[in-house]
Each structure stands twice: as C-alpha cells, then as structure tokens.
Amino acid sequence: MNNRFLDACWGKPVDRTPVWLMRQAGRYLPEYMAVRSKCTFLELCKTPELAAEVTIQPIDILNVDAAILFSDILTPVEPMGLKLDFVPGPVFEHPVRTMADVEKLRIPNPEEDVPYVLDTIKILRRELAGRVPLIGFGGAPFTLACYMVEGKGSKDWANIKRMMYAAPDVYAALMDKVTMMDMEYLNAQIKAGAQAIQIFDTWGGVLSPTDYEKYVLPYTTKLINGLNRQNTPVIHFVKGAGTMLETVQKAGGDVMGLDWHVNLGKARDVLGQNMAVQGNLDPTVLYAPKEVIEAEVKRVLDENAGRPGHIFNLGHGILPTVPPENAIHMVECVHRLSQK
C-alpha cells in the first residue's frame, strides 16, 4: 500500500512528498464529464457505484497519493430538513433565519439518511484495495451554516453575520445543531472506512480573527474533539486564514490546510513542528506553461525545506477548465523533485 499520505499526516518521514488535489474528481476530466452527462450532480453524489467510479478516476489518471470521497459538503444538510438544489450552485429553498427555523431542524442518522455516502466509502475501500488511502470529508460547522442561513452562495455573507451579531442565541442554537450533525456524519464515515478526514471551512476566512475566535473556533474545536480519530488523521482547511493560523490551530487536528496567500515555510514556523501542513499552490498556476508549473512546484517544495509532514496540494480546488495534462505534469513534478 502507498502510505505516503498517511505517514505525512502523522509527520513521519517519506521517500517523496505525497500529493492529491482538492476537487481532483471533477469537471476538468473528460472521464468525469462522461459519467456526469448521464445524471444530475445530486444523482451522482447519491449513486454509490458512480460516485466510487469518479473518485477513482484521478488515481488512475493523475497518479495521486490519496483518493477523496466524491460528494458535496451540503449532502448531510438536506436530511436536516432543508430542500437542496443545484442551479448551478447550491440553493436551499427555505433558508434558516429564526429560532423557529432552527428548532425545526433535525439531527440526521447517517446510516438511515445518507446511506449512499457510507456505501460509496465501502465500495471504494474494496476497489482501491490499499492502492492509496481514502479521505472522507465534511464542511466545517460555520461554512455549512453560511449556506443554510444565506440560502445560496454570497459575496459578503451578510445574513449569517447579521445573525451572529444581532441574534446570537439563534446563531448559537444553529451552530450547536450543525456541529452535532457534522460529528455524527464524520464519525459514520470513519466507521465505514474513511482513513483520513478533511474539514473544509471555505468561508471561515471571511471573518476577522477576533470574530473567528469568538464565533467559529469553539464549534470546530468541539467537532474535532468529538471525532473517533485514534488512527484517522484530521486535516483542517480554513480558506483565507493566513492572518490567524495560530488561532485556527487551537481547533486541533493533525494537518493544517493552507491556501496560496501564505508562504508555506513561514506558516510552518508559526505552527511548529508538531503540525503537518497541506498545500499550497495557487490553482491558476495549472494554466501556465509546463516549465512555469515545474518552477512553482519547486518553489513550494523549497519553502517546506524538506521538513517531514508536508502534503502537496493546491490552495483550493482545481478549476474546471484546467487541461488535465497540466495536472498530470504537476503531480509528476512533485514526485520527481521531492524524491529522497
């Protein structure tokens, strides 16, 4: 088995830097689009055989060192009682705005309400047969709450911020419920066979460091502390968190995901030797000529300076129009340039 990814999560030495890409199963791959053309996005998420097929595609095509479950962070929110659609982005028909809305939300039972996610994990563990580890994932409580309150994507997330400041009791009740749901969901993924967990806090960086510490950190900390993670490393990725790495680190976890706005070496100095890091190439570099991609890969590796506990990744998801051959080249460069 290729254990490079798991070894790096635990800060152990590896023969070369492991690499995978956020959204590595996605629209930039013609093979993914061939499967996606037969069904809607939600149908793909809810059909275990198809979700497993697209999860494995980048392992075969890119030669990455880990697979990540194909799903969506909002998958477990729908059975809380919010109708979800994608048109093309996520839209909730009835956003959560009042205490009455929060009280209507239920805590789903993952085995009963999202069995397709757990079935996908079981199929993947069987089909991957130890080739690479399987990462499960979920949204962080704050990012999930952003979508639930806003009802859709937003540039300023004014509704969730208004709730935070003007109705803190409603915000706290919502975050408590979402955190409990998240804990049940991620523990069910671990039980089904996920070998690592990534928590995506895509919108945590829209808050000031003070507000993040007050309104987000307690819930993410509770979530991470509630995971059955004896042998399952947890990656915590907060996009836009470069100015508050020490605060984010207080949440716990084993690996800090970094976006491309921070120098990876300086981030490692701040975080200390006991926390592994993941990242952090700007996703748009994959539009560059191959020699530029190689130079940028080398720069990120040089910033890490050979320290153990580095997983190479993009600073956010791969973009849908990236040429697949550029992603293949990036992975090859990481492996070749980091070979011990």
UniProtKB/Swiss-Prot annotation:
Please provide the record's keywords in A-Z order.
Cytoplasm, Decarboxylase, Lyase, Porphyrin biosynthesis
Gene3D superfamilies xrefs: 3.20.20.210
Q: Where is this site: Transition state stabilizer?
A: D72
Show the GO MF annotations: uroporphyrinogen decarboxylase activity
Tell me which InterPro entries the record gives: UROD/MetE-like_sf, Uroporphyrinogen_deCO2ase_HemE, Uroporphyrinogen_deCOase
Q: Which GO terms describe its biological process?
A: heme biosynthetic process; protoporphyrinogen IX biosynthetic process from glutamate
Is Ribonucleoprotein tagged as a keyword?
A: no
The primary location reported for this protein is cytoplasm
**Localization in the cell:** Cytoplasm
SUPFAM superfamilies according to UniProt: UROD/MetE-like (SSF51726)
Keyword Magnesium listed? The answer is no
Q: Which reaction does it catalyse?
A: uroporphyrinogen III + 4 H(+) = coproporphyrinogen III + 4 CO2
- Give me the residues that bind substrate, please: R23, Q24, A25, G26, R27, D72, Y147, T202, H316
Instruction: Give the domain of life.
Output: Bacteria
> PANTHER family, alphabetically?
METHYLTETRAHYDROFOLATE:HOMOCYSTEINE METHYLTRANSFERASE RELATED, UROPORPHYRINOGEN DECARBOXYLASE
Family, per entry? Belongs to the uroporphyrinogen decarboxylase family.
| Quaternary assembly | Homodimer.
The protein's name is Uroporphyrinogen decarboxylase
This chain's source organism reads Geobacter sulfurreducens (strain ATCC 51573 / DSM 12127 / PCA)
Ranked from the top, the taxonomy reads:
Bacteria, Pseudomonadati, Thermodesulfobacteriota, Desulfuromonadia, Geobacterales
Q: Which gene encodes it?
A: hemE
